[in-house]
Amino acid sequence: MSFNHQEIEKKWQGYWEENKTFRTPDETEKPKFYALDMFPYPSGAGLHVGHPEGYTATDILSRMKRMQGYNVLHPMGWDAFGLPAEQYALDTGNSPAEFTEHNINTFRNQIKSLGFSYDWDREVNTTDPNYYKWTQWIFLKLFEKGLAYVDEVPVNWCPALGTVLANEEIIDGKSERGGHPVERRPMRQWMLKITAYGDRLLEDLDELDWPESLKDMQRNWIGRSEGAEVHFNIDGTDEKFTVFTTRPDTLFGASYCVLAPEHALVADITTAEQKEAVEAYINSVKMKSDLERTELAKEKTGVFTGAYAVNPVNGEKLPIWIADYVLATYGTGAVMAVPAHDERDYEFASTFNLPMKEVVKGGDITKEAYTGDGAHVNSAFLDGLNKEEAIAKMIEWLEVTSAGNQKVTYRLRDWLFSRQRYWGEPIPVIHWEDGTMTAVKEEELPLVLPKTENIRPSGTGESPLANIDEWVNVVDPETGKKGRRETNTMPQWAGSCWYYLRYIDPNNSEALVDPEKVKQWLPVDIYIGGAEHAVLHLLYARFWHKVLYDIGVVPTKEPFQQLFNQGMILGENNEKMSKSKGNVVNPDDIVASHGADTLRLYEMFMGPLDASIAWSENGLDGARRFLDRVWRLFVQDNGELSEKITDAPNKDLEKAYHQTVKKVTEDYAELRFNTAISQMMVFINDAYKAETLPKEYVEGFVKMIAPVAPHIGEELWSKLGYNETITYASWPTFDESKLVEDEVEIVVQVMGKVRAKLTMSKDASKDEMEKLALEAIQDQIEGKTVRKVIVVPGKLVNVVAN
């Protein structure tokens, strides 16, 4: 008979809720373990089967660690600000707050139905004013430290929608919603100076237990480059511009310069003859995103300004072009071009027939750019030097002549932090009529997002908050000075940068987190989530954590000690699950048909946790069949415990049991859940063959399966006679000596041919082995003379007889 999953799951979920089984005390006697999931955005679509994969992994670890005597922090919350809720509100006329609350309730119920051992008393919600009070507080600290500033930045402006769009919301230069044209336009934006932490964000990666591939993604994103800045005067004017280059040794080979179309000097230096062409080009670039502009494969475009720069090292005049592959937001917005030794410059020079000059020997520049090392030529005081020597000598020359200097730059840009949206945290800043700007006082936080029916974009590039006069307009009570609140809101990243800290102390109204508690719980021991957050979320969270470390709020340099990216669950056809493809599997349906324990077991058994694997109904059915086999082995049809279960030991199962405890314990700790489950299946097969089942082994097995299938675990535990939950029962241990066989199989040969196989004690002496072997082959050697007996202890006996 199989078990009734609906009955059992409802019963134990009710028990856990009523008894607050997973409440985490802030005690310090036990060692701590902090298992964190990337909290979800509560979308209207609800949970999909990809969510529980990571959640089950952290839950297995959390449940095992509790049984091993750890105080476990395993929380859940909601990353609930963001564009989809605002979009839904615009489309339906409903409030984003109501929509979000409804979605959170759906998500919470779905997550509870899967039996995760979260401490729901610690639930956080980024849209709760009691939470975002502290998001705003962190912003104030950034502002005080000079790490939050206002700048004019080119953004994606959609005139038809009257709002700024993120790069992800644009497809082929048109808005994803409605297909309207999008243009680049400079706008006043809040920026966070993450670049000030570039070196620390890079260096501290070495101390983390993260996948190397993920660390490399962060390293590449930060993109530290060492080189030099070079100053170029513009011929016939007092103007100059600066370029950064990693190859100052090739300065003698520069044959033209390129400015970003948005560069401040372009309008001033363009000649009358070139004005029309330059303006037309600048307009054409407005429609392109940074991503499109810098694509390596795209055709090179550009236009000559009519102006010339002067090469500081030899006085040569270099034509100044503008081209879209140079971005105003990257580096200095200007490059010196050395087509003979740079691939992109080579393509551009080939397209526009610009001169090339070889300054490093080793290639054939009539065919391609040579980017390798070699002796310098045509380079005056650098001739004959290799790359490293020439770079050092040129930097020395630049610094002596004040034509440039040594410089380290980063690919990392400062973080564009403002959004022209309603549904986000208000930025706590006031702009006064006299042009000054002050932060809202700490005691006035939270600055609450006002309720409004009118969340349509303002059309001016400001957020919809600009429409709410009574909220926006303020008067300084002391001076009578008039001001306007900042109308931009924070991005969705803000609330997710620090949520792991709030779980530690979720109801503290006096501080972001209690210093003693944060000392107890940090760093997070394991953080599991999807690889799509490998760069931005983790980089932003690490940045904020380091700022909080600098001001004494947190005691560790890094937030997440170990990180793991789960793979993706694909549709049965190996395609990504999506509503449009109609291949989305809803976990509610599986919980109803097969049970939460089956879903959890199946998702952990599909394959390695970091692999992307296709969903399979057959696999799901197989997982259920295994749980049914476990149930039938231990429970009779009448619901009583199996009569095979006894207090007496059973030598036949001893090795299999201890092997299983060892492998499951080690595999769980290393996140190898699929192989741990395989081992439990092997044990169940052995247990079916055994005459009796020692109760100690049954209890040990139930403890091991409970982290994966907690409802069945609890039910079997209660049938074994326990009134308390299995949650805090002690984890089974194994005996190394029991993993070794006491007896071995010995091969007996006569003249090199196998004639018998014997089982004997592994410690049998040579004499004993010889005696037993000769007895076993008595009939084979009858009438023959035994000339010699070769004994290999523990392995074989070879008898030479003729």
UniProtKB/Swiss-Prot annotation:
Enzyme nomenclature, EC number: 6.1.1.4
Tell me the InterPro entries matching this sequence.
aa-tRNA-synth_I_CS, aa-tRNA-synth_Ia, Leu-tRNA-ligase, Leu_tRNA-synth_edit, M/V/L/I-tRNA-synth_anticd-bd, Methionyl/Leucyl_tRNA_Synth, Rossmann-like_a/b/a_fold, tRNAsynth_Ia_anticodon-bd
Q: What is its main location?
A: cytoplasm
Q: Name one GO cellular component term.
A: cytosol
Q: What are the alphabetically sorted keywords of the record?
A: Aminoacyl-tRNA synthetase, ATP-binding, Cytoplasm, Ligase, Nucleotide-binding, Protein biosynthesis
- Where found in the cell? Cytoplasm
Task: Supply the PANTHER family for this chain.
Answer: LEUCINE--TRNA LIGASE, MITOCHONDRIAL, LEUCYL-TRNA SYNTHETASE
* Protein name as it appears in the record: Leucine--tRNA ligase
Q: Which organism is it from?
A: Bacillus thuringiensis subsp. konkukian (strain 97-27)
Supply the source organism's classification: Bacteria, Bacillati, Bacillota, Bacilli, Bacillales
Q: Which gene encodes it?
A: leuS
